[in-house]
Amino acid sequence: CKVAHTYIHRRQTTDRFSSLHRPPDPDRWLLLPCCSEEARGPPPSPAPLPARLFPGRASSPLARTPSAGAASACKPLLERLPTPSRRRRRRRATRRARSRMPRTTPWRAPRAPARAWWTRPRMARAR
């Protein structure tokens, strides 16, 4: 029931245009029908899916119990999950930052490396 609490509480506090929008109030949670022990009975069984959604697999047991099929499909993923990830290979820093760019770019000439101001050619040097 805690999950329903947090979900309803989050919807109330984040939906600005909802009629339920109000600051969080834990006392209102007691009015929810799922919170009293006698109000919520046994957990509901998963509803059987209609056969026309899966015409080919209507006779398979997975089509009638969606939760069991989802759990069995997720099990190899859950078993593989705690495998430690491999360390990322670090790419060595190259001397020129533009070395990974293509040599020629179709819409402009490749950039010449920037030169210091004292090596730039003087503008009016004509003698």
From Swiss-Prot:
Residues 102-121 have a biased composition (Low complexity). It comes from the Eukaryota. Residues 85-101 have a biased composition (Basic residues). Residues 39-127 are annotated as: Disordered. Contains several arginine residues in close proximity which may be involved in protein RNA interactions. This is Cold-regulated protein 1. It comes from Hordeum vulgare (Barley). The lineage of its organism: Eukaryota, Viridiplantae, Streptophyta, Embryophyta, Tracheophyta.
